[in-house]
A protein has these predicted regions:
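Extracellular TM2-ECL1-early TM3 structural module of rhodopsin-like
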Residues: 24-33, 58-118, 125-135
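Extracellular N-terminal segment of 7TM GPCRs
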Residues: 1-41, 45, 179, 188, ...
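Loop architecture of class A 7-transmembrane GPCRs
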Residues: 10-18, 84-105, 128, 134, ...
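Class A GPCR helix-loop hinge within the 7TM core
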Residues: 108-146, 209-211, 294-302
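Intrinsically disordered regulatory tails of 7TM GPCRs
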Residues: 1-19, 168, 257-270, 299-346
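Internal alpha-helical transmembrane segments of multi-pass membrane proteins, especially GPCRs
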Residues: 64-67, 108, 142-146, 190, ...
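Hydrophobic alpha-helical segments of membrane proteins
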Residues: 75-78, 154-161, 197-204, 233-252, ...
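Intracellular effector-coupling site of seven-transmembrane GPCRs
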Residues: 176-181, 192-196, 208-246, 258-272, ...
Length: 346
């Protein structure tokens, strides 16, 4: 009797898992469509304004390139949405499978490296004010951005070089053509260390140094010039951290399945694979958040929004930290000068 019931229970469990997976897939398609539209429109607007309407400054160059990375990420999301709608059938061929994966990973690395460069730039600007006033140029910012894009391509290729289409009787899938679990595990660790951990350490150290520096400034809202970039960095790491946690759990599940496979584990993995879509949606969400952060964290944004979007972005990307530190440096020199004059009078 038990032998008769067991297969029935397994069939019911599998059927429930399929229904759940299908429902989650539809929700994710809807979320990805929203992210794609807002990401393309929002970042397209930032690119248009910072690239064509605003005066070129170092900050404008940083955020222009960040918007380009997010725009590419959002635009290529269209191909993933179509694939998800077709129940993960990939109709675009081998080259687009590789290119779509390359752009997705490349954009992630570029965003991370740009945020790291912005943090280091802010750190140097707060500690070495004279250097920031004389050596910090738009040309150098453009060269650094070019190097960042080249480095992003180099870091991305090992992760996507094995991407290919897998054709079966029922559908064609865009897959990572890695057979060995150990190779996949190394890729997960590599992506986490290079694309998340090291940048996080550098960015954290930069803002600790900035905090130490501005603590000595006797100004109200002394961290105000840094709040937009801080918000951008925090949103990036909060959006991407669950993705890397998921990847390590996925590796653990694969190891479990390799050593002790079971129907229950397979059913759980099927639902877990759909949870991945929500986690990826959170990572994708980061690509459309930045334009909203620029606008809503801008000082008096409602008043400036009525006048011009250009003014909103100019205010958001203003290099106030340099002006703040320059004023502090000048007042310090002035007080020293007055002190020196007093001694001579005696």
């Amino acid at each position: 009797m038990n032998q008769t019931v067991a297969p029935s229970n397994m069939t019911a469990s599998t059927s429930n898992a399929d229904v759940t997976a299908n429902s989650l897939r539809k929700i994710n398609i809807f979320l990805h469509c929203i992210i794609c539209v807002f990401g393309v429109v929002g970042n397209g607007l930032v690119i248009y304004i910072t690239g064509l309407k605003m005066k070129s400054t170092v900050n404008a160059i940083w955020f222009l390139n960040l918007a380009v990375a997010d725009f590419l990420f959002s635009f290529f999301l269209i191909f993933n949405i179509i694939s998800e709608y077709r129940e993960f059938d990939w109709p675009f061929g081998d080259f687009m499978c590789f290119l779509n994966s390359l752009v997705t990973v490349l954009s992630m690395f570029a965003s991370t490296f740009l945020l790291t460069a912005i943090s280091l730039d802010r750190c140097l600007s707060t500690w070495v004010v004279v250097w920031a006033r004389t050596k910090r140029t738009v040309l150098k910012a453009r060269i650094i951005c070019l190097l960042i894009w080249l480095a992003s391509v180099a870091c991305s290729l090992p992760l996507v070089i094995s991407r290919k289409t897998s054709i079966s009787a029922q559908q064609t899938k865009c897959i990572l053509g890695i057979q060995k679990l150990e190779t996949y595990k190394r890729q997960v660790v590599y992506r986490f260390v290079v694309g998340f951990l090291l940048p996080f350490v550098i960015i954290s150290a930069s803002y600790v140094a900035i905090g130490v520096r501005v603590k000595h400034l006797r100004k109200k809202n002394k961290l105000k010039p840094f709040r937009i970039i801080l918000a951008v960095i925090l949103s990036f790491f909060f959006c991407w951290l669950p993705f890397y946690v998921y990847k390590f759990i996925e590796v653990w599940l694969r190891e479990m399945n390799a050593t002790n496979p079971s129907d229950e584990l397979n059913s759980f993995k099927k639902v877990f694979d759909q949870i991945e879509l929500f986690i990826i949606s959170l990572a994708y969400l980061n690509s459309c958040l930045n334009p909203f952060l620029y606008v809503f964290m801008c000082e008096d944004f409602q008043k400036k929004l009525k006048q011009s979007l250009v003014m909103v972005f100019e205010s958001a990307f203003a290099e106030e930290h340099l002006a703040l530190l320059s004023q502090h440096s000048q007042s310090k020199r002035k007080s020293h000068s007055q002190s020196g004059t007093g001694i001579e009078m005696k």
